[in-house]
């Protein structure tokens, strides 16, 4: 019938939504303006199928922690050293559709920086005295603990291991982290103090910086920001390091606290 010919399959609208992010409400409105109707039931059916696929892909299961040492406090030494002699306090096996089987290791102390504040975690390896090397492909945070991710367990778990952070990778991350602060200051200097950092993602390859501003930057603004950042890099300003500074003093000294950052 003519009414059936004017009914557009929901699968077509879902492809627009899923692939290009085109809102289904807008698709429906455009179709209605042209005398067509969207089969919203079949659209919702496709949406549920996609949600189910995503749920299954994200399925992850954790084995219980296997505790080797009763040592609940973990020390981070990675600001001063990229190597440390460590013991494995506990470990567990994790299964997921995405990564297969991996292991999570907790050390009594660690030079590995765990993913935090938009900065990715360190990578590297641990090595035993008998030459057993296990690669650490990520470091994440769970509560106050740094957790080290690896594809394999060491052959012997009760040894002392030399934990080594990939120094070149860490240095690239540090450079990009510093660049976010330079960029933030450049934006505030050039666009105004209303600019606030809304989020960031810092890796060894690049960084993303999200910020608030009331309009799109024009080319002259972009060039000014680039010149500001590049001039500070070329000046090679000495770093003044301060640790464990009270919040009030840090803010009085000009630190900008962005506690809602993601």
Where are these predicted regions, by residue range?
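A glycine- and charged-residue-rich anion-binding loop/surface
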Residues: 1-262
């Amino acid at each position: 019938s003519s009414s059936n010919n004017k009914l557009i399959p929901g699968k077509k609208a879902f492809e627009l939504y899923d692939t290009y992010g085109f809102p289904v409400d807008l698709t429906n409105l455009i179709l209605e303006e042209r005398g067509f109707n969207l089969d919203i039931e079949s659209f919702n059916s496709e949406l549920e199928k996609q949600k189910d696929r995503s749920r299954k892909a994200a399925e992850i299961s954790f084995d219980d922690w296997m505790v080797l040492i009763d040592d609940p406090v973990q020390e981070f030494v990675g600001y001063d050293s990229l190597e440390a002699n460590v013991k494995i306090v506990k470990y567990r096996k994790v299964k997921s559709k995405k990564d297969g089987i991996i292991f999570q290791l907790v050390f009594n102390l660690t030079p590995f920086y765990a993913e935090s504040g938009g900065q990715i975690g360190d990578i590297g390896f641990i090595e035993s005295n008998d030459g057993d090397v296990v690669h650490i492909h990520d470091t994440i945070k769970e509560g106050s603990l740094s957790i080290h991710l690896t594809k394999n367990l060491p052959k012997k778990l009760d040894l002392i291991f030399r934990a080594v952070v990939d120094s070149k990778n860490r240095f690239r991350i540090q450079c990009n982290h510093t660049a976010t602060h330079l960029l933030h200051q450049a934006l505030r200097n050039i666009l105004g103090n209303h600019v606030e950092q809304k989020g960031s993602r810092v890796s060894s390859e690049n960084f993303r910086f999200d910020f608030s501003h009331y309009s799109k930057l024009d080319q002259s603004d972009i060039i000014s920001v680039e010149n500001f950042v590049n001039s500070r890099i070329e000046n090679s300003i000495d770093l003044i390091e301060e640790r464990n500074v009270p919040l009030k003093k840090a803010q009085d000294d000009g630190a900008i606290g962005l506690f809602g950052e993601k």
